[in-house]
């Protein structure tokens, strides 16, 4: 199979939405019957985002094969059916690490290691490898043209443009076309300068995606075409919309996919966007609203919980309700108590690391349990629910996790020292292990308890979900917790690790050690999120009757 490559760059400012634009184009091409994948090349020096602060970088998206990747890969999986893996995201840090490892082994036979050709060759090899087996590979270059960090990546794709030729490569550049209220018009000069910067390093864009808060007038598109040396039909206006799931149709209406298909000489059907039309219709026509309180520690940057946010919206689509997320700092719960938890239809406690705010999360779990309020715990959200139950129901007053209190008399949650991975291999860790890449990561099989809410949600006796954690339920306390009424509704493939817990006599109190948000999509949703939002809607209706 001959793979075609579309390289996506950004100019003027960051956060223009390159990832969404790339994913939307991929969705249209997939709707035409093409096999599409997307890669993200990140210019930062970290080997991966695994140890980066969520408040700086946003969430870490975990792939099926256990790679800790950029949150844009979450967008990719939500827009197309192709599953991402570790080949779909790499950083400057990883490239340099691999090149230096080869140099230490003597693979370069004593050569002087340089950015060109050694670093650029390594980048090109990864791009080609990531695209193998697909009709089209869309490659997003992180950062903004003009940043010094991005230069090795830009040089690499310039070389690929020459080596593969025009019939296998296309360069798409996103720019900002701002509207100046004082002048009453949009300004094209930033786009002209951005294209000039890109051309100065040898890349001539074939397509311009012009971002702005409004559609670009026809005369301004003609002006951009003239000054940037791009066909007028390849100047695409991408205005702000109230839903990112409208963007595939917006790009399709301007013929972007036709331009790509013609350029590459691909034979394929017309795009069928009926699934996306259904998503947009459901989003625009809810029959009600539920308010979900998300109790976390990274709430100052909602992107820290990007996949959770999207999964809740997807569940709303399936339940025909709009979901309003109320972000609640867990430290505020510690300071103000239950008053900040009033007026909610459900509580969700997402994953996280570190002691800050953990008691507020425990308090939120207690509030949900005692008030029959739907509760959904994810990763740490499961652990705090178990700690709360151990303290207040099972008679272990000072129960805790050894992550937060190594001296606790009841370490109901502790460091996992050994587990079996998805291929049956035994993984081992200890306290001194590096933080990066040492967690239980990736897709794992979970056996579900017959008759449990978990089994009902999944409509079966097993599921496969992605993990990212170091701590687990301490098996020493399983029997005591079960006797007190806690249900262990999900166990690992070897049945040695607790994957899910729930409460019997509660409308919906379910928690999982894994991250189900990573597999939720707008077209398919996710059974646990759907069950949670359905329970929240039912709780609201019961309250209204009262």
Curated annotation (Swiss-Prot):
InterPro entries: Class_I_gatase-like, CTP_synthase, CTP_synthase_N, GATASE, GATase1_CTP_Synthase, P-loop_NTPase
Family matches, as SUPFAM superfamilies: Class I glutamine amidotransferase-like, P-loop containing nucleoside triphosphate hydrolases
One GO MF term attached to the UniProt entry: metal ion binding
Binding site for Mg(2+): 72, 140
Binding site for L-glutamine: 352, 380-383, 403, 470
Binding annotation for UTP: 14, 187-192, 223
EC number in record: 6.3.4.2
Regulation: Allosterically activated by GTP, when glutamine is the substrate; GTP has no effect on the reaction when ammonia is the substrate. The allosteric effector GTP functions by stabilizing the protein conformation that binds the tetrahedral intermediate(s) formed during glutamine hydrolysis. Inhibited by the product CTP, via allosteric rather than competitive inhibition.
Reactions mediated catalytically: UTP + L-glutamine + ATP + H2O = CTP + L-glutamate + ADP + phosphate + 2 H(+); L-glutamine + H2O = L-glutamate + NH4(+); UTP + NH4(+) + ATP = CTP + ADP + phosphate + 2 H(+)
Extra remark beyond the main annotation: CTPSs have evolved a hybrid strategy for distinguishing between UTP and CTP. The overlapping regions of the product feedback inhibitory and substrate sites recognize a common feature in both compounds, the triphosphate moiety. To differentiate isosteric substrate and product pyrimidine rings, an additional pocket far from the expected kinase/ligase catalytic site, specifically recognizes the cytosine and ribose portions of the product inhibitor.
Family to which the UniProt record says this protein belongs: Belongs to the CTP synthase family.
Name of protein: CTP synthase
Organism classification: Bacteria, Pseudomonadati, Pseudomonadota, Gammaproteobacteria, Alteromonadales
């Amino acid at each position: 199979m001959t793979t075609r490559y579309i390289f996506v760059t950004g100019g003027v400012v960051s956060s223009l939405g390159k990832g969404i634009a790339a994913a939307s184009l991929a969705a249209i091409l997939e709707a035409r019957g093409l096999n599409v994948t997307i890669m993200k090349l990140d210019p930062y020096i970290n080997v991966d985002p695994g140890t980066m602060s969520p408040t700086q970088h946003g969430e870490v998206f975990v792939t099926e094969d256990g790679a800790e990747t950029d949150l844009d890969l979450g967008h990719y999986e939500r827009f197309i059916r192709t599953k991402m893996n570790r080949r779909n995201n790499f950083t400057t840090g990883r490239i340099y690490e691999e090149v230096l490892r080869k140099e230490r082994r003597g693979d370069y036979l004593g050569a002087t290691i340089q950015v060109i050709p050694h670093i650029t060759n390594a980048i090109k090899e990864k791009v080609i490898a990531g695209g193998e087996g697909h009709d089209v590979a869309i490659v997003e270059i992180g950062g903004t043209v003009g940043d010094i960090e991005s230069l090795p990546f830009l040089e690499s794709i310039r070389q690929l443009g020459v080596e593969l030729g025009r019939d296998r490569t296309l360069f798409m550049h996103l720019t900002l076309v701002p509207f100046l209220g004082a002048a009453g018009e949009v300004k094209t000069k930033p786009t002209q300068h951005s294209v000039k910067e890109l051309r100065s390093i040898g890349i001539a864009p074939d397509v311009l995606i012009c971002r702005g808060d409004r559609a670009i007038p026809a005369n301004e598109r003609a002006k951009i075409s003239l000054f940037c040396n791009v066909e007028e039909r390849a100047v695409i206006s991408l205005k702000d919309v109230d839903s990112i799931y409208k963007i595939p149709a917006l790009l399709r209406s301007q013929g972007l996919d036709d331009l790509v298909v013609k350029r590459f000489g691909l034979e394929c059907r017309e795009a069928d966007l009926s699934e996306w039309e259904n998503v947009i219709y459901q989003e625009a026509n809810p029959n009600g609203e539920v308010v979900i309180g998300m109790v976390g520690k990274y709430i100052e940057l909602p992107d820290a919980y990007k996949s959770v946010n999207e999964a809740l919206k997807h569940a709303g689509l399936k339940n025909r309700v709009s979901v309003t997320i109320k972000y609640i700092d867990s430290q505020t719960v510690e300071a103000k108590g239950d008053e900040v938890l009033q007026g909610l239809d459900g509580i969700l406690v997402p994953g996280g690391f570190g002691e800050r705010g953990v008691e507020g999360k425990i308090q939120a779990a207690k509030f949900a349990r005692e008030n029959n309020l739907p509760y959904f715990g994810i990763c740490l959200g499961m652990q705090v629910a178990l700690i709360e139950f151990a303290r207040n129901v099972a008679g272990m007053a000072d129960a805790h996790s050894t992550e937060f209190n190594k001296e606790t008399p009841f370490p109901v949650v502790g460091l996992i020292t050994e587990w079996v991975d998805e291929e049956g291999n035994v993984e081992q860790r200890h306290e001194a292990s590096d933080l990066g890449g040492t967690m239980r990561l990736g897709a794992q099989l979970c056996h579900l308890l017959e008759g449990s809410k978990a089994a009902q949600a999944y409509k079966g006796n097993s599921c496969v979900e992605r993990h990212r954690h170091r701590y687990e339920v301490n098996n020493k306390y399983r029997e005591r917790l079960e006797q007190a009424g806690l249900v262990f509704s999900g166990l690992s493939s070897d049945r040695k690790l607790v994957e899910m817990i729930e409460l019997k006599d509660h409308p919906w109190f379910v928690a999982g050690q894994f991250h189900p948000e990573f597999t939720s999509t707008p077209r398919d949703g996710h059974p646990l999120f759907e069950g949670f939002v359905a329970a929240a809607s039912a709780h609201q209706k019961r309250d209204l009757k009262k």
